[in-house]
Design a protein with these regions (language model features):
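Small-residue-biased structural context
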Residues: 1-173
């Protein structure tokens, strides 16, 4: 199923990003300086690639169709699980950006802690979240959606990926 294959491939990129975020946190803990611009680049990737591009496809296409077609099990899984975790990731990214801005004005230990806390929290959240999607959500969709619904997911995913703004953002990252 093309739509899910793309999402799984994007997960691989996001996992690598999460490794980089944790490495950045370790570097700060080991006494290296905080690079606020690097932190802001991480936020840009998180908001653009992981959230807008990847979560956008999930929320606007796959999850939407699952909610329409697969009943209360999908409703609980998507609304009470995946969407809540997407929102938690957004919170971490917003808090991380605010911490980087504060650190530039006041390079205190507290602001450094907020950078580490939100970067590591985001990476941990996304790694666990990706496991749930790959092992539970996507397999449920592949098993339970009709052939027609799978074709709809694939077609809408291709259209999303062909959007010029989305193509430009994928090329950027």
């Amino acid at each position: 199923m093309y739509g899910i294959e793309i999402l799984v491939d994007e997960h691989k990129n996001i996992v690598e990003f999460c490794k980089s975020m944790k490495s950045m946190c370790c570097s700060i803990i080991e006494g290296n300086e905080v690079d606020a611009n690097l932190v802001k680049e991480c936020v840009a990737f998180g908001k653009t690639y992981a959230d807008h591009l990847h979560h956008g496809k999930e929320e606007k296409i796959l999850f939407k169709i699952m909610l329409e077609k697969l009943g209360p099990v999908a409703d609980k899984l998507i609304r009470n699980g995946m969407l809540v975790e997407h929102d938690l990731g957004r919170l971490h990214m917003n808090e991380l950006l605010e911490a980087a801005d504060r650190y530039e004005k006041d390079p205190s230990t507290l602001n450094k802690l907020d950078i580490i806390t939100n970067a590591a929290g985001y990476a941990t959240l996304l790694n666990r979240h990706i496991g749930k999607e790959d092992e539970v959500v996507y397999t449920f969709a592949e098993r339970a959606l009709s052939a027609e619904d799978k074709e709809r997911v694939d077609a809408e995913t291709k259209a999303f990926d062909e959007d010029p703004e989305n193509k430009a953002n994928v090329a950027k990252y």
